[in-house]
Amino acid sequence: MATEMQAAPVLSTPDSLILEATEPVARQNATRTLSDEELSITYDIERTLQEIRQARYKRIALQFPDDMLPDAPRVFQLLSRGLACRDVDKITVEKNGNGTGGVESEKLAQDVSQLSVDDKPEPEPKLYILADTSYGTCCVDEVAAEHVNADVVVHYGRSCLSPTARLPVIYVFTHKELPIEPVIQAFKATYPDQATKIILAADVTYCDHIPAVYARLMEEGYTNLYATELIHCPSSAIPNRTVPDSVRENPDTLSEWQLFHISDPPTALLLTLASRVAAIHIYPTTDAPSDNVKPLPVSTSAALGRRYAILTRLSTVPIFGILINTLSVKNYLHIVEHVKQKIADAGKKSYMFVVGKLNAAKVANFSEIGGWVVIGCWESSLVDSKDFWKPVITPFELELALKGDHERVWTGAWQSDFQSILDQPAEEAQTADHEESPNDDDDMSEPESAPPEFDLRTGRYVSHTRPMRNPAPRVSAQSDDAVSAASGPAAARALARRAKGELAMIGGTVSPGAEYLRSQRTWKGLGSDFDIQYDDEDPSDSTLVVEGRKGIARGYTVGDSIEKH
C-alpha cells in the first residue's frame, strides 16, 4: 500500500542554484585547442595572404559560418601579423642589391626625382569579421561586406560557389582530416569490377583529398576513374565540378558513370544527379573513424515523388509569392523578372518579398499566397521542410507547375540552378488563350465560358485559378442614366456596384490580394451569418429579430410571458 505524502512535492529549484556553476556555459569547440601552425594549415593562411598581397586589397571582410566563429579572433590575428610584414623581404632585397644596371637605375632615379608627387604612405590593410550573414552561410554576403566598404570577401567553410555580382571572393574551404586507407577499402568493396566507370567527388571541405585517393586507386588497378576538380559553374553536368571529356562533348553519356562521393552532399546535388548518373554511393565522414565504414547507396525516388506532388498541388494556385533569398548571386535580378513574366503569362498574380533568412514564421503571415518561389543559390533554393504552411519551390519547378495538365511531363530530371533556365532558348508563341483579346465581348465574357480547373490533390473545383485573365469589369445598366454613368468620368462610376463574382480592383487593375482581404479577412459584424441581397436578386429569408430574455439573475421572463426562468 502506498504511503501518504508527508510534504508537498518540490516543483522548482532553490534560489541558490543560480549562484552555482553546475554546467559550462557553452561547449568548448575542439578546434580552439589547435596550435597556431595547425590553425594556419586548417584556414589556409599563407594562400590567403598571398592573394591579398598580389591584388593589393586594403579592406578585407572575413565571413565565417556559425560553427567557425570561435576561431575567428585567432584567424584575424594570424592574418594581421602576416599583412604587417608583407614588404619586409622586398625592402631588404632592394637595400642589398648588387648595383646591376646602374645606368638605367640612375636615369630612372633622376626621372622620378623630377616628378612632384606627394610621398604618402600606403594605407595599411584592414580586416573585418562578418559574424551574421544576411542569408545562407554557403553564399557570399556582399550586403554585409558593402557596409564596411570591403574590397574583397574571404569566405570560410563550405560554399555553393555561385558567381557573385559585385565583389571578388577568396574561398577558403578549410582542411579536414580524412584517413585514406579506410576510403580505399570501402571503395574496393563497393566496386569489385576495376573496369567500372566511376567519378570521384567530394564535398568542398574534403576536395583536397581527391588527388591522393585517385592515385591510390590507380595503384590498385582501377582503369576507368575520373577525379573531379572544383570549378565555379553550378550549371555544369556535375555542379561546380569538372566532368570527363566524353561527357563534355555529349552530356547524355554521364548516365554511363557512377559517382563515389566523399562526405554527405547537399540534397540539391543529390536530386540534380539522380537522373544523370547510373548510381551514387556516399562515403560518410560524420561518424567516428573506423575501418569498417560502408558507402551508402542513394535513392531519391521518394524525394522526387514528393517534389512532383507539390507541383500538382500548385497547378491551380492563383497567387504566387516570389521570395528573394539572395542579393549577391549573379543575374538574380534577371531570374526575378523571368519568373514574374512566367507567372503573368499564365494569368496568375505574383507578389515579391525580401525577408532575409527564410523561416516558416515569416511566410506564414501572408495567408493569401498559395505557393512560394525561392530565388537563391542552387543549394538554398531547395526548401524541403514540412514546417512551411504553403509549398516552397524553385524556378525550375515553377516552369512545370505553370504548364497545363496535358503538357506537364515528369521525366525525373531536376535542377536547381536558375542560370540554366535563363540560358534556355525562347519558347514558341503562346497558346490561343494568351492571344485572345480581353476586350472582345464574345471571348471569356463569363467565368462559365472558361474550362473548369480542379485541384488534382483534393479534387475540388477552383473558381479563380487565373485571375489576371478575367476581362475588365463592365457595369451592367438597364436605364439610360445608368449607361451615362457608366460611360462618364471616374467620379460618376465610383459607386457602381461590382458584378457578382468579380474580383476587387485597385487603380483599375485586378488585385487578387485585395480580393482575398475583402472576402477572407474582412469582418462583416453582427448579422453576417447570411448574405446581403440586392433589390434585383431573389430575396432570401433571414432570422427575424425577436425580444429576448429580460430581468435579473433571480429570474428571467421571455417576451410577454410572466413565467420566470
From Swiss-Prot:
Keywords: Cytoplasm, Iron, Iron-sulfur, Metal-binding. The keyword Iron applies. One of its GO terms (cellular component) is 2-(3-amino-3-carboxypropyl)histidine synthase complex. It is found in: Cytoplasm. It holds the Pfam family Diphthamide_syn. Binds 1 [4Fe-4S] cluster per subunit. The cluster facilitates the reduction of the catalytic iron-sulfur cluster in the dph1 subunit. Its main location: cytoplasm. Residues 424-458, 464-483 are annotated as: Disordered. It comes from the Eukaryota. Pathway: Protein modification; peptidyl-diphthamide biosynthesis. Component of the 2-(3-amino-3-carboxypropyl)histidine synthase complex composed of dph1, dph2, dph3 and a NADH-dependent reductase, predominantly cbr1. Required for the first step of diphthamide biosynthesis, a post-translational modification of histidine which occurs in elongation factor 2. Dph1 and dph2 transfer a 3-amino-3-carboxypropyl (ACP) group from S-adenosyl-L-methionine (SAM) to a histidine residue, the reaction is assisted by a reduction system comprising dph3 and a NADH-dependent reductase, predominantly cbr1. Facilitates the reduction of the catalytic iron-sulfur cluster found in the dph1 subunit. PANTHER family: 2-(3-AMINO-3-CARBOXYPROPYL)HISTIDINE SYNTHASE SUBUNIT 2 (PTHR10762:SF2), DIPHTHAMIDE BIOSYNTHESIS PROTEIN (PTHR10762). This is 2-(3-amino-3-carboxypropyl)histidine synthase subunit 2. It comes from Aspergillus fumigatus (strain ATCC MYA-4609 / CBS 101355 / FGSC A1100 / Af293). The lineage of its organism: Eukaryota, Fungi, Dikarya, Ascomycota, Pezizomycotina. The gene is dph2.
